[in-house]
Structure formats: C-alpha cells, structure tokens
Amino acid sequence: MHFHERFDVIVVGGGHAGTEAALAAARMGSKTLLLTHNIDTLGQMSCNPAIGGIGKGHLVKEIDALGGAMATATDFAGIQFRTLNSSKGPAVRATRAQADRALYRQKIQHILQNQPNLRIFQQAVDDLVVENDKVIGVVTQMGLAFEAPAIVLTTGTFLSGKIHIGMQNYSGGRAGDPPAIALANRLRELNIRVGRLKTGTPPRIDANTIDFTQMTEQKGDTPLPVMSFIGDVSQHPRQVSCFITHTNEKTHDIIRGGLDRSPMYSGVIEGIGPRYCPSIEDKIHRFADKSSHQIFIEPEGLSTNEIYPNGISTSLPFDVQLNLVRSIKGMENAEIMRPGYAIEYDYFDPRDLKNSLETKAIEGLYFAGQINGTTGYEEAGAQGLLAGMNASLQVQGKTAWCPRRDEAYLGVLVDDLSTLGTKEPYRMFTSRAEYRLLLREDNADLRLTEKGRELGLVDDKRWESFIAKRESIELELQRLRSQWVHPNSALLGVLNPELNTPISREASFEDLLRRPEMDYAKLMSLEGFGPGLDDQQAAEQVQIQVKYSGYIQRQQDEIDKAIRHENSLLPLDLDYQEVPGLSNEVIAKLNNHKPDTVGQASRISGITPAAISILLVHLKKRGLLRKIA
C-alpha cells in the first residue's frame, strides 16, 4: 500500500536530530515528511532536563545561527540559566539552561506543527526501499510505503534497544517506548559497519521526599542569559534553583556490594558507555580513591515533583538504587518515582558517512544523531540540521555543504566522526577544536548566519536582526578606531583616574579599550566617550574583537596556512606502502581510515606533521596533488 503523495525528504524519528532535520529541509522549501512512532513524544528530552554546557552550548548557538529550533525552545522552557566558565576567556564560556521537559516538548511541537512544507505522520518505520544502491522510500509497521529520494534516519537509542535494570533486561527504545527491531535488522543488511553502544539515566526522585535544607543551593545567573541570538529574557518562564549534594563512603559501599548484580560488571552489557558521563558504578570503580562525588539536584519542570539527580546514572537493581539514594545527604527519606536504567543500542560506524552525513553505501540515505555514535541532545540536533539541509540540497540538485573545522564546532564534530570514527559515545568539548578562539558561542551568528541565509535556512526576521547587529558592530569599531585622545585633551580629566598608566601620547579609543584595566562598559560610561551600543550582544562582540585582535589574527594565520593543503585530495587507489619514508604504523592507520583529503589524514591519531610532509612531497613528485573543486 502506497501513500497518496510523494515527498522530497523523509525524516524518520522525532527526537532532537529528527526535529532539526525535518525543520531544516522544510525551511529550504523541500516537501518534507516527519515519521515518528508517537507524535506526543516529539521533542522529548529522554535523559537530563538541560540544554547547553561546555562545547554543547557552542553547538546550540550554531544550530540557532543556522535557523534551528533548539535555542528558541530553550528560551521558552529554561527554568535556570547559567554562563559556565564566566571568569575564563570567551572561547570556553558556555551557556547552560535547566529546562522544563513539558515546556520544551510543547515549544518544539508548536514549531513543527506550524512549519510550512512539513507534514507529520505517526507510524514506526520497519523497512527501507532501496534500488540499485539508492534509497527511494520507507515502509511503516502497517505496510504503508512512503516515497522520497532522500531519507534521514534519526533513530536515537531505538535500534535493537535493550533496557537493563540489574540482571533483568527487556527490549525497549527508551523507558515506555518500543524498540525498532525490524529496522535495525534491515540496516544490518547494508554495507555499513555496525556496533553496540550503551548509555544510562539516573532514578527520578520525588521532590516532596527530599530535604533541600541539607544541600547547597545553586541559583541561576543575574542578569539572565538567553540561548537564542533572537531570544529575549521576557520569554523565560519562572526561574528556580538547583541544589548540590554528594555521595559518601556509605554510598560507595552500597554500590560495591551490588556490583555482582550489575549488568555492566557481570558481562551482560556489551556496549561501551560514555566516557564523560559515566554511571555511578563506573565512577566508584575508576576513581576508587575518591571519597565522594558531586550530585546536582535538578528540577524536571515547574509542574512536576520529579527531580533528576545528575551524577548517579545507574543500572543497578532497584533495591540497590533505593539504598544508594537514601545514603546521600538530604535524601535519607527519598522515594524513587522512576528507576534508573542502562540501554544498549545499535550504532553505525560514522567513517562510512560522507561529511554531508549521507551514507557512502546508499545514495540518498542520511544518518544523524546517536545512530552515528554520538551522545547528547546538542550533538544530535547539530547533525540533524546538517543532514536535513544536505538531503534538501541533494533533491534540489545542489552541492552538499559542511562547515570546515575552523568554521564551526559542527565542522569539528562531523570531521572527527567521518575521519576517526568512534568506539564510545562521542560528546563535544571545546578542547576538540584546535581553532576554538575563533569558534566562540558569541560569534556563531557572525560565522554562520550569512551561509544559512544563502542555503535558505534563515528566515527574514532572523536575517534582519543579524544584519542590524553586524552593521552596528562594524560602525562602532570604525568609531573607536577613528576617535583619538591627545595628551592635552580635556577628556584626560575623566580618563586618567581609570587607567593604571596615564596617557602620555595620543591614543585611539580602540587603544584605550585594549588596555587590560578597561572594558567597553566602563569606557562608554566616561563623559565624552559614549554613548556606545545598547545591544549587549553587539557590545560584547566589539570588546572581544578589540581585546583579542592579536590572538585572533594569529589563529587566522594558522588556519590560512593549514587550508592551503586541507582540501588536497588523496587518490582513492593510493598505495601508502609505496610512499617512501612512512612508518609501518602510519601506513596501517592510513589504510585503516582511508582519508579523502590531506586535512583528514592530518587529524588521524598518530599521524605526525612529518608524515604529512612526506605524503605531500610524494603527491607533488607524482603530479597527484590536486584540490577539491
């Protein structure tokens, strides 16, 4: 049975990757269908009730700069906002918001249901229709076939998902949802390497049974940050506090006593879990010398009593979970509302993807999110946007696009995955980006919004706001460079008391702002120097561009140098054994990863700059050095 309409792009799955993929394709004008097993769970936050953080917040800002929904939904759902690393340099500052699950889901669903060119249909997908290594459609659980030349799979943890609580396990996509068994089996027939990964979630606690007076209160920032470049504090709902408590030796003894019934430590779970979000069992085992571990007590929303205890993800049996929770200060009488669990699921080796996130094996088939071995809402959303966008470009007969590593964290993410692959759930950190001084949260729109507009991702409202901001930054920088203070100027009366060293020669306003003791707000508050910019985002940009100009230029020079060979192609039939001077280790790694370009080769672990130089000399001698058009 065939559906009565054809589509340009079909997106399978309605989580963070799927929603961004469907919205991106639809914004670009493609007739798009979003298939989900349950419309009510579109935009569901399956694990922690938070968006953003170190590295992750950078991705959210990039999604936003390209017209995505995640930041906007967070502004409408965020019940606590904080800027992390606020005392450090701008490259590593990151916005994090505690989110009300229900409000977030409602906002995402509202955006989806009001997006032109987008249809939503509730049915699980069981099969792909492939002809001559090209996807042409999908078949749902009830045998209904939908046709489209581009399919984006965003299956999350549903592919052959298996939930573990103690020694008990059962099939599931997440708690309360069925797994995608038939689709997983179909995908295993394709010529794409497959593996198993694992993630987990903590038990949820009834807030009425917690003694918050025994814990440390953690309030949000004042003034409140916003997540979206076009967001406003007035969109935020009521703000609440989080709390901090700790495990103790009694907690650790309870956990150790239950390890014989842990699916992780008894060999029941095969999948590898996230290194940077370990279960409490892993923490006790890996950091045996630590007497306590921090736990963040996070509200799940304004209309629920459920609490998310961030830091005690576990798959231990329920009785052990209850005992370990009640051993923690402030939770002596706590009641568990939902047990913690681990979930194993299929993922596919992202080295079998192009950087457009299209599979190399099947034309028109795109993967995004946890199916590619990543973990996290933000990583999923960023991939979803890229996959949906490239699916739309393919249907339009246009060239695929992916930002470079020096252009976006999204570029770092995709390049890491498609070049290096992953054996454990991959999450983003600022440390993964070698050019992080240029890839800041604050300038994501300046880096990407113009490209987003060119691609058709950015609407008029966002574009007009961006143009106004960009012009105000440029005009203010011109003003600061063109206005000067002289040693005999009347302005020195208000200026010199604010300086560590008084003015002895003429200086531009830009020179004054560059001084370590001066900031933009202080300079603009002095009589004769203002009034300055009212837009705080633009003012921040002016200050950063002035104060860090030397470092920014140095990093740009490094990028220009690397880019000269970044896109130099490596011939598909290149025999690395024939390249004189390469070590056996380097040859093995190059043969294993099969990089497409010199840039990709340079980022393979163990490939030294010397090896890249040898490779370039060999290619040049053979007349094989050519670049991507």
UniProtKB/Swiss-Prot annotation:
Which terms under GO biological process does the entry name? tRNA methylation; tRNA wobble uridine modification
Location within or outside the cell: Cytoplasm
User: SMART domains under this entry?
Assistant: GIDA_assoc_3
Q: What does this protein do?
A: NAD-binding protein involved in the addition of a carboxymethylaminomethyl (cmnm) group at the wobble position (U34) of certain tRNAs, forming tRNA-cmnm(5)s(2)U34.
Q: Which residues are listed for FAD binding in this entry? A: 13-18
Please report any disulfide bonds recorded for this protein chain, giving both cysteine positions.
Answer: none
UniProt similarity note: Belongs to the MnmG family.
Please describe the quaternary structure of this protein: Homodimer. Heterotetramer of two MnmE and two MnmG subunits.
UniProt keyword annotations, A-Z:
Cytoplasm, FAD, Flavoprotein, NAD, tRNA processing
PANTHER family, A to Z:
GLUCOSE INHIBITED DIVISION PROTEIN A, PROTEIN MTO1 HOMOLOG, MITOCHONDRIAL
Q: Which InterPro entries match?
A: FAD/NAD-bd_sf, GIDA_C_N, MnmG, MnmG-rel, MnmG-rel_CS, MnmG_C, MnmG_C_subdom, MnmG_C_subdom_sf
Residues binding NAD(+) are 273-287
Query: What protein name is recorded for this chain?
Result: tRNA uridine 5-carboxymethylaminomethyl modification enzyme MnmG
Q: Which cofactor does it need?
A: FAD
Pfam families from the entry? GIDA (PF01134), GIDA_C_1st (PF21680), SAM_GIDA_C (PF13932)
Q: Which organism is it from?
A: Shewanella frigidimarina (strain NCIMB 400)
Listed under GO cellular component are: cytosol
The keyword NAD belongs to this UniProt entry's keyword annotation: yes
Provide a Gene Ontology MF annotation, just one. Answer: flavin adenine dinucleotide binding
Q: What is its main location?
A: cytoplasm
Statement: the UniProt record of this protein carries the keyword Secreted: no
Q: Where are the transmembrane segments?
A: none
Q: Which PROSITE patterns match?
A: GIDA_1, GIDA_2
